[in-house]
Amino acid sequence: MAEPETLNLNNEVVKMRKEVKRIRVLVIRKLVRSVGRLKSKKGREDALLKNQRRAQRLLEEIRAMKELKPDVVTKSALGEDINFEKICKKPDSTAAERAIARLAVHPLLKKKIDVLKAAVKSFKDARQNVVEVKSSNSASEENHSKDTLCSNDDASKLQHEGTIIREQKEKEAKILAKKPINNSKEKIAKMDHGPKAMDVPNSLSKPSGKDSPASSASQKTPSDPKMKALSKTKKMKESSSSLDVDSDGEELYEEEKEYFDDSTEERFYKQSSMSEDSDSGDDFFIGKVKRARKKESSCRFSDKEQNPPKNLLLEEGILETHQNLQNDKNKPRTEARRFESVFFQSLSGSKSLERNHREQVPRSKTMDFQHIEPQNKNQFNKKAQRGFENTKQKSQLPLHPSWEASRRRKEQQSKIAVFQGKKITFDD
């Protein structure tokens, strides 16, 4: 049977504090009203004095109630059955006793106290039942232990008898085993002569076994030098491949470096002195950019020159002659080239460039032809023919600078897209 839930009376008393305070307020309010009625009554002097004494006693009870603690009221109500009439009739009763009795008799508090009393009583009964069950269980356990002791004694006796019987059987078996021992000895003596004859061929076979490891060792030795030679060749291949990789990496690194000498700078200044009104800073940076471009183009065509296509062998001769002519004509023009404006090229050029533009043939589109990779044979031929026609036409009909400037301006204006958005109007 399971133990009942523990009832902590102190916790219940603490929970009752709120109820006791609420009931105390109600009782004090009632007593104050009764005191007011007693004082307002009129009559004879004896009746007035009697009413005053009652009112005085009620005031004392009110003061005692205010000083009382709620826990005292609940404990006294739980401990005894309080009768308010008996306590009031006592001549020596104090104001505190009367106040406790008055509060305990209140119907709201009395209900709570009755519930607590019933819970305490049921808890006590449950505890008593648990004690009785435990005592009965202990008695049954004692009886069971006595029975087990008796059964253990019987089992020990049976085991002792069984051991005695086993010992007797073992003795009998030993006596029977001694008799056939003599017969077995004679059989063993006969069997000893057989193994001696069998040992002779075994001894002859042993030296042949010794020769086998020697032959296996001789087989292993010739294979060792071959393995060593293979391992050496593998190591040599790995080292050579690593050296090739390192050398390729160094060559690429040297090609990527930008080579810049004083001799190239002096040569560039000599060539640029031919043009008029040229700035030294711009020429310096332009030369550097040109050299970088030439290096990139040479790197591109170095791979293609190793495997040139057969179809382009005849065209290379024509292009070389054409490029030599163009380079001789446009040499001072290209060396004095500057970064030009995106929108109006005429604004960025100097006066010397304008004079050179009048005198010299305009630059053709085929100047940087060698930088473009030929994709197809037909395109290559068409571009070469266009370059020849343009140079002939421009050399025959040189335009005035003002006409050329207006033409360029119109081209730039035609490239600018027209505004296609909506106009925003701001209303009042």
UniProtKB/Swiss-Prot annotation:
**Location of cross-link Glycyl lysine isopeptide (Lys-Gly) (interchain with G-Cter in SUMO2):** K190
* Biased composition annotated in UniProt, kind: Basic and acidic residues: 184-196, 352-371
Q: Which residues form a coiled coil?
A: 45-72, 109-130
Keyword Acetylation appears in the UniProt entry: yes
Residue ranges annotated as compositionally biased, kind Acidic residues, are 245-264
According to its UniProt entry, the protein's GO biological process terms are: maturation of SSU-rRNA
* InterPro entries named in the record: Bud22/SRFB1 (IPR037393), Bud22_dom (IPR015158)
Q: Which cysteines are joined by disulfide bonds?
A: none
Kindly list the GO CC terms recorded for this protein: 90S preribosome; nucleus; perinuclear region of cytoplasm
The record's principal subcellular location, in a coarse class, is cytoplasm
Instruction: Give all Phosphoserine modified positions.
Output: S203, S205, S263, S278, S280, S348, S350
Keywords from UniProt, A to Z, are: Acetylation, Coiled coil, Cytoplasm, Isopeptide bond, Phosphoprotein, Transcription, Transcription regulation, Ubl conjugation
- Spell out the subcellular localization from the entry: Cytoplasm, Perinuclear region
Question: Residues bearing N-acetylalanine?
Answer: A2
List all membrane-crossing ranges: none
Instruction: Give the span(s) annotated as Disordered.
Output: 132-155, 175-284, 350-428
Write down the superkingdom of origin: Eukaryota
Q: Record keywords: Ribonucleoprotein included? A: no
Q: Where is the composition biased (Polar residues)?
A: 213-222, 373-396
Q: What does this protein do?
A: May be involved in regulating transcriptional activation of cardiac genes during the aging process. May play a role in biosynthesis and/or processing of SLC2A4 in adipose cells.
Subunit annotation:
Interacts with SRF. Forms complexes with SRF and SRF cofactors ARID2, MYOCD and NKX2-5. Interacts with the N-terminus of SLC2A4.
What this protein is called in its record is Serum response factor-binding protein 1
Species this chain originates from? Bos taurus
Gene from which the chain derives:
SRFBP1
